[in-house]
Every structure is written in C-alpha cells, then in structure tokens.
Design a protein with these regions (language model features):
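Short hydrophobic/aromatic helix or loop-helix immediately within or flanking a transmembrane segment
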Residues: 27-59
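Non-catalytic, alpha-helical, charged scaffold/linker segments
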Residues: 176-182
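Transmembrane signal-anchor helices characteristic of membrane glycosylation enzymes that use polyprenol
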Residues: 1-15, 19-26, 182
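Membrane-interface alpha helices of multi-pass inner-membrane proteins
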Residues: 141-173
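Transmembrane-helix signature of polytopic, membrane-embedded enzymes
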Residues: 78-104
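Specific aromatic-rich, kink-prone transmembrane helix
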Residues: 120-138
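Short acidic/glycine- and proline-prone juxtamembrane loop motifs at membrane-interface regions
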Residues: 113-118
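Loop-to-helix entry region of an early transmembrane alpha helix in multi-pass inner-membrane enzymes
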Residues: 52-75
Length: 182
C-alpha cells in the first residue's frame, strides 16, 4: 500500500523510495543478496517512525530518514577533511577546498539528498580510508578483528563495500594480509 504513496511522487532517476518503504512498513524491501544487513540497520528507524506516527497521527518517515542521512553526509565530509589534513597532510585551506570540491560533484550532492543507502556507504568507506591512512602513516597493521568488524558493517550495507575493505586491508597489511593468522 505504501508503494502507491511514494512511487508516483518520487522522481529521481536511478533512485527509488525503498528506504521510505522499509521505515514506513518494515520489511525486506532491499535485495538481501546485495544488502544483507540493511533491513536490520533501518529497523530502529522503523521503530522510531512507528512511535512518532502513533503519537502524531502522520507518517514522519521523511524526518526520521533525513536525520541519519544528514549525519552520515556530515561525517563523510569530516572524514574527507581529516584524510586531507591528517593522512595527506595538506594545509587547512587546501584540505577545506578539496573537501568542498568533493562534495560539489553532482553525484555526491544528489546522493546526500536522496533517502538511500549511498550516503551511509560513503560514510563507511570514508571511515575505512581514514583508518587505513592512519594505520599506514603510523606503520601499524589491521588486526583480524578490526578488519572483520569493518567488513561486517560495510558489507552489511552493500556487499561490494566488503571487497573495498579487503583491498584496504591488503594495502595496509601488505604480504601479511595473506597469512592465516589474519
């Protein structure tokens, strides 16, 4: 029933209102092969929306989804900035300029405005890049449990993100990435 509410009004090419549907009426609206944990990640949002809907008598899904998307985009920006400052060691002006330049790309601007999992993936991947950069800078390696936790969370949002976490582990750990202890 909710698909009929969101689908005629949601016109962004390449995006669909699946997050709105899942938060409004919790179900496995995402393909669980590609997004194994995403339905469970949005479950607390469904609980919050159900409580707010019962309290106010209207569907508050736009507000409930907007808060985590805004937080994820803000922290993705902060991680881009910190990568530029702490890992690449740029000056403050240059780091700010490059961070703003990254967010000026149309695809990034559109992704942080739509209610989809792209912003959450971007936040998690920027965190992975930042953490990997710091580990390389301080000549440390990923431990197996750090990689496993990072893989579980990022691959839970989108399975292809897990491959990127493994690549970061390969670049950080080098040859020791292939050891059985890792």
């Amino acid at each position: 029933p909710y698909w009929k509410v969101f689908e005629p009004e949601f016109h962004l090419s390449g995006y669909d209102p699946l997050t709105y549907l899942g938060v409004t009426d919790w179900d496995f609206v995402y393909n669980v092969v590609r997004h194994p944990l995403l339905a469970f990640i949005i479950w607390p949002l469904w609980l919050l929306n159900a409580g707010l809907s019962a309290l106010f008598g209207v569907n508050c899904v736009q507000y409930v989804v907007a808060v985590p998307v805004m937080l994820a985009s803000f922290y993705a920006y902060l991680f881009i900035y910190r990568i530029n400052r702490d890992v690449i060691r740029l000056q403050q002006y240059d780091a700010t300029l490059l961070s703003a330049f990254y967010f000026s790309f149309a695809y990034i601007m559109l992704s942080v405005l739509v209610p989809d999992h792209f912003t959450i993936s971007m936040f998690l991947l920027m965190f992975t890049l930042y953490l990997s950069g710091l580990l390389i800078r301080f000549n440390r390696e990923f431990t197996w449990y750090e990689s496993a936790l990072l893989f579980l969370i990022t691959a839970g949002v989108t399975l292809s993100n897990g491959i990127k976490v493994f690549f970061s582990g390969l670049f950080v750990n080098g040859k020791s990435f292939f050891r059985p202890t890792y």
